[in-house]
Each structure stands twice: as C-alpha cells, then as structure tokens.
Design a protein with these regions (language model features):
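Non-catalytic terminal segments and appended small domains
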Residues: 1-135
C-alpha cells in the first residue's frame, strides 16, 4: 500500500485557541483534552480508511450541531486529498451527519495559518428523538 499522508497533532497553542473558542472551555480543561488526542488509525489491515476520534465524547440531542476541533493535521503528498466521511453505521442507522457531507482536506492545508487544524461539524438529524454520542 502506498503511503501518501502522515497525521500529526497540531501544536498545543493552536489547539488551546481553537478548542476554547469552539467549546467555551477553560485553558486548563483544553490542556487536559489535548493530552488525550489520538492520531487517526486503521482499525484493520483491510480498512478502506482511517478512523478519526473525537478528543472528548459529545452527546447531541436531535437537531443539535457541534463543531469539533480534532487536534489533528495531515501532511499529504501533492496531488492527493484527504476525504472525511461520517462512520457509516452512525449515519445509516442514526442519521448523524457531517454538515458538508464530505470533508475535503487539500494537500496545501497543512501549511495554513491555523496549522491545517482539521475541524468536523456534525448534526444529529435523528427523527426518533434519540440522543447520539460521538467519541
């Protein structure tokens, strides 16, 4: 398998800025979250993609939207792109959706002003009144 990308954590400074802005958390709370960030990984040898993990577990009531600073940036070879999709089971069974349907991370985003920090915006579109958790 050809390696075209490598995942990294954003700097602690960048994460604290983004996390506190998105969640209203204190700096000390954000530092604790930063320490728990896990890099994306393949679940099995045959996995088609990498699993991303939310830095914290979130619960969403129906119709609620959340913006998640992942703490992750990705170094991608020129000419390649990272595509982000919601986990199929959460979308298919429970209507948890990414607000832009598919997240597109271009190879030059790694050098963006925010260090290429990847954010995910999700909405609980569940019509059965079910609260959903993201981990």
């Amino acid at each position: 398998m050809q390696k075209v990308a490598k995942f990294h954590k954003v700097s602690e400074r960048q994460f604290l800025t983004d996390w506190c802005s998105a969640t209203g958390s204190s700096t000390s709370e954000a530092k604790a979250v930063y320490e728990k960030i896990r890099l994306p990984r393949r679940a099995t040898v045959g996995s088609a993609g990498y699993d991303f993990f939310a830095p914290e577990t979130f619960s969403l009531v129906p119709r609620e939207t959340i913006l998640i600073p992942t703490g992750i940036r990705v170094e991608i070879k020129d000419g390649w792109v990272l595509q982000l999709y919601p986990r199929s089971g959460l979308g298919f069974k429970y209507s948890l959706q990414m607000d832009n349907t598919v997240g597109i991370i271009d190879s030059d985003y790694f050098n963006a002003k925010n260090e290429g920090h990847i954010f995910v915006k999700m909405t609980n579109q569940n019509r059965q009144g079910r609260n959903l958790s993201v981990a």
